[in-house]
Amino acid sequence: TAGTDGKTIEDIKGLSDREVIETVRKQLADYHPQSVRRVFIPKPGSDKKRPLGIPCIWDRLIQQCILQVLEPICDPKFHNHSYGFRQNRDAHHAVSRVVSMVNMYKHYYCVDVDIKGFFDNVNHGKLLKQIWTLGIRDKRLLCIISKILKSEIEGEGIPDKGTPQGGLISP
């Protein structure tokens, strides 16, 4: 899916690995993400729509680089039975854990919590502080993450909170 620049992965497939790496390096030297394209998709089981923020392809590549650095550092520090938005964990694993708890410990209580608009209201400062607490101390990287969080949303302006769903470092 194209971002605001109209480019997709097809537009950069012809570049050599060296050209891609050099372009990413140049962009990271003084990183300024392009604006994010707003797209609305249907929410399952509802008439409402979920807003997605679609970054430009080069910004997605940079986010992928960041994800590949952050994930192996942060993931081992997360609770072992946390299943949302984690690699190799899904709803089936969560259900299996619940069934196991019911069978082993006879726990029959379940709480279903859905925090309305959670990702749209994440405090940027608190998120960056949490990333610091998890051991990410590189100030340049934290600055880049901050810029990504504050990427202009086409037609809406610069957000002061929230993580635009649709990027690689967002849910």
List the model feature ranges, each with a label.
Residues 20-23, 27-28, 32-39, 77-81, ...:
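Conserved polymerase palm-domain catalytic core
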Residues 15, 60, 72-73, 121, ...:
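Residues at alpha-helix boundaries and the short loops/turns that link adjacent helices
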